[in-house]
Amino acid sequence: MHFAKLGAIGLLGSIICAYAASAASKVIIDNDGLTDLQVLFALQAKQQILGVTAIYGDYTLDDSLFLASDVLSTGNLTYCIPSFAGAAQPLLRTNNTFQIWQELYGSYVWQGYWQPEYETANTNNESYIYNTQISAAQFIIDMVKANPNEITIVAAGPMTNLAIALSIWPDLAKNTKSLVIMGGYVDSQIAQVTGGDFLNDMYSDFNLFMEPEAAQTAITADWPELIIAGNITSQVYPSQSLYNGIIARAGGMANIESDSGLSYAKQFVGNGTLPSGSFPFWDEVASAIAAWPEIVNSSYDAYVSVDTAYDSPFYGSLRMVPADLVPKKGVRTAKASMITGINVAMFYQKIYDSLTAEYSSYCMNGTIITPSNITISNTTNTTNTTGFY
């Protein structure tokens, strides 16, 4: 069941949001399963989140909308950060063609909402809030037109919403400040072959292969800046020492359990013990790069495209060429900054800061309440992280 925002509430949310961050840099988060830290990183960096656009992918569109609403409502952020429904399925690819391709070229460990045993994220059939007045693609267009050359889009799911928006308004990309994507793995076959199903999944380019044609359309558009957070997003993990640091900064587990202002911390640490098989900070790393560009400590430039040949074993994979070998005809490419390393100590510190702050007043007056200024060192990995590239 969906509860749409009334027009007056949507307008009020826009006014409040403008008040809360009128002078901030602007960001739109496009994702198939929003996480807490994606929102909190942007707020901590004093970015203005214009909205969240949901899409199919890891989850169905309905589940993606539910997760976005859940993330925002936890911090009382629903009425100043609107969310919008995007594509419910790819434009071209179907589950049938997806399965046939796997029979021809090999299976993916993770298939998102096409997983045969897929289970809804909204297990209790809860109601949730999102804006039904316009689509995600139209929202992106409207915001870029209203804020030319000011908006960073963080795309951490399949890129169908962006492809639709670009088909409606081809000048969208060149009027945007930058596009940061989560995806675009390169040179990862050794890790996939030798690391078992877990590592194979970690380096499967899900956001590209769910709809390669949309990914190619979006990635090779005329963005002033294209930042690809690929391999690096599969190399930064949560740790027990990270959990311990969050708990210490929040004043202990008892305080986390009793203080409603620490709801994000509570959701993150659970019972205080790191679960086995924890996944890396995929989308969070991309959002951190968008929030704090200085977190990047190594990268290189390449001209990129996405393989859109269905009869190719690399269908849906990112391809790269150097500047002097860019195709002059045929395949369209775009210059991208390929991120290969971040300051992991800084990343963990941003997690501490984000999860132990209190956001319930943000929509009313832009206030984020933080605990006393404590710096917790993470002993698991405070070095810079680089990976396969």
Curated annotation (Swiss-Prot):
Main location: endoplasmic reticulum
SUPFAM superfamilies, sorted: Nucleoside hydrolase
Top-level taxon of the source organism: Eukaryota
Single GO cellular component term: endoplasmic reticulum
Family statement drawn from the similarity comment of this UniProt entry: Belongs to the IUNH family.
Record GO biological process: purine nucleoside catabolic process
Signal sequence interval, chain numbering: 1-23
UniProt keywords, alphabetically: Endoplasmic reticulum, Glycosidase, Hydrolase, Signal
Disulphide linkage map: none
Organism: Schizosaccharomyces pombe (strain 972 / ATCC 24843) (Fission yeast)
UniProt cross-references to Gene3D superfamilies, sorted A to Z: Ribonucleoside hydrolase-like
Locations listed in the record: Endoplasmic reticulum lumen
Molecular function as annotated in GO: purine nucleosidase activity
Record protein name field: Uncharacterized protein C800.11
Listed Pfam families: IU_nuc_hydro
InterPro entries: Inosine/uridine_hydrolase_dom, IUNH, Ribo_hydro-like
